[in-house]
Amino acid sequence: MAESAGFPLAEPGLWVERTSTTNFPAGRPALFLDRDGTINVDTGYPDDPAAMVLRDGIALVIEAANQRGIPVVVVTNQSGIARGYFGWDAFARVNRRVLDLLAEQDVFVDMVLACAYHEAGTGALAIPDHPMRKPNPGMLLEAGRRLGLDLERSLIVGDKPADMEAAQRAGLTHGWLVDGEGSTMGRLSVSPLRDATDLDGLLNAIQSL
């Protein structure tokens, strides 16, 4: 993997970081998570580690996957980098803080992918509809390739329709939309994640993998 300024950049606008040392057998499903608005409370364009707060219930979700030996993979769009609001250095600090907050709850993530490409960006990051940017499925497919995942059996949790579309296009069949509505997108069944009952349904799905 090419690195830039010490960061795990597979290309100028794509961060791919293995954040655990766990080895998974090929063919495992994964739990894909969006970051901002799903793991942590969304603050717009997050560049301040001190502002990071975990969303209620997310530690339980990750704990269930950790206990089942299910890879936990973060897939996050970060257009603020392309727009010049902050750089990879700020992203790294914020992301480290999010992972540290999870570690304080004794849960962990296995891989983080972040896409900085956006049509409103500048320079090498000014690419419209980049295949790695959700709703395109590139980050999920890249994680699937690197970890040997069974994408069809994998689950996703996100707070935007783009998360669900990316999952559908990557071949997943089950997703949960934070504060959203249930729906069907092709073969992807989308469940809402709004209350304790919805959370129990997600935990049961993870425990059944």
Language-model regions: role of each:
Residues 1-31, 88-110, 119-156, 160-209:
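Asp-based, Mg2+/Mn2+-dependent phosphohydrolase catalytic module
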Residues 2-73:
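Active-site neighborhood of HAD-like aspartate-dependent phosphohydrolases
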Residues 36, 43, 79, 83, ...:
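Short glycine-rich loop/turn motifs that provide flexible caps or phosphate-binding loops at active sites
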Residues 39-42, 73, 113-124:
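Short, basic/glycine-rich phosphate-binding loops at helix/coil junctions
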Residues 39-40, 79-83, 119-121, 163-164:
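Short, active-site-adjacent cap segments at secondary-structure transitions
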Residues 46-73, 82-97, 132-137, 141:
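Short, acidic loop-to-helix structural element flanking the phosphoryl-transfer center
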Residues 71-77, 110-115, 177:
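Short beta-strand segments at enzyme active-site cores
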